[in-house]
Amino acid sequence: MSVRELIIVGAGPSGLSAAIAAKKRGIDCQIVEQGVLVNSIYRFPPQMVFFTTPELLEIGGLPFVSPYDKPTRAEALRYYRKVADTFDLQIAFDERVLAVTRDEDERMFELETRSSKGVRRVRLARHVIFAIGYYDHPVRLGVPGEDLPHVSHYFGDSHLHYRQNVVVVGGGNSAAEAALLLHRSGAHVTLVHRHPTLKRTIKYWVRPDIENRIKEGSIAARFSTCVIEVRPTSVVVRQIPDEAAATDDEAARQRELFADADASRAPASALVAPGPSDGPAVNEVPADAVYLLTGYRADSDLLCRAGIRLNEREAPMLDPRTFETNVPGIFVAGGAIAGKDTGTIFIENGRFHGDRIIEAIAQRL
């Protein structure tokens, strides 16, 4: 069985960037990807627009040409296909890495993989880079009914839900954009968020839109509310005491903003930012479909099985200069570095990790 100098787990932008750097150095490299090219971007909603400019998504020095200030999902997919072809990168698709272990003499690593059709194989490499991102592993609520067929952690095409009751759980960009798209496609939308306010990180052009739709009652909103069960035709929710509202300026601003919402236009399920004086209440929200857009995490179990130590935030412990972990020869790049703090690593900064990793590997050869 042949031994590669380097295997990169993940064909996202950070993995592709590392592979390009390796190729420029003449380092034998293979990418193994459990899904398709840039799988996370592929799973974004079809109408998705990036929160950045094209040049900040570029890798390998290949220009990302777009007529727009902010590129679309379709443009990004086309660009990264061009990257893979231009640099003739070796990528094995539909291979999920199950485990990474050292062989007995510790001169190489064994990667056990399995395809969606159940085909298993073992690959050997002297160095491994985990560039697995985090979008493939949603943060689960752990409530009854979370696995029902009408429940998803990923938002797709809003047209499917014309005239349906749809519950969107979350308070960030994904939830806000999904709620708006659903509303404009004729769905009856209820937004459920466990905190008293929307997240501060919502895109600047999305925030006024979602706030105004809530204010006018077009989108029902339940702040300081958590999901306790998903049923076939409804979602059971419970209010959370809004203890932080008194000291949170943003919470106060949003309560004032939504206070005069036109109740006559809002669905019967609408409830906006309950205050601390309101007792906890449990009730049901009608739901033909449910989107749990509550965030994502890297596959920490896979990292741990490879012997990588994680800190209290589930981020891998590594050398900040080289991104090498406590396991010599294993590196981490891109979103997998972030642990629970997924808002710190993006394509814009993760695309540079590969250069530093490959520099460290090249010095050992």
Outline where the language-model segments fall.
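Rossmann-like dinucleotide/flavin-binding elements
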Residues: S2-V3, I8-Q34, Y154-T201, T322-L365
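Active-site acidic short loop of glycosyltransferases
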Residues: V3-R4, L124-R126, R163, P232, ...
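Beta1-alpha1 glycine-rich phosphate/pyrophosphate-binding loop at the start
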Residues: R4, A11-L89, A176-W205, N311-E312
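Short hydrophobic core segments
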Residues: I7-V9, V122-Y135, V167-V169, P286-G295
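Glycine-rich nucleotide phosphate-binding loop and flanking beta-alpha elements
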Residues: G15, V38, A99, Y135-H137, ...
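Short glycine-/acidic-enriched loop or helix-start segments at secondary-structure transitions
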Residues: A18, I41, R102, V139-L141, ...
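A Rossmann-like FAD-binding core segment of flavoenzymes
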Residues: D88-E95, A99-T101, D105-G118, V122-A125, ...
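FAD-site-proximal beta/loop scaffold in flavoenzymes
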Residues: E146-L160, A263, P267-V272, D278, ...
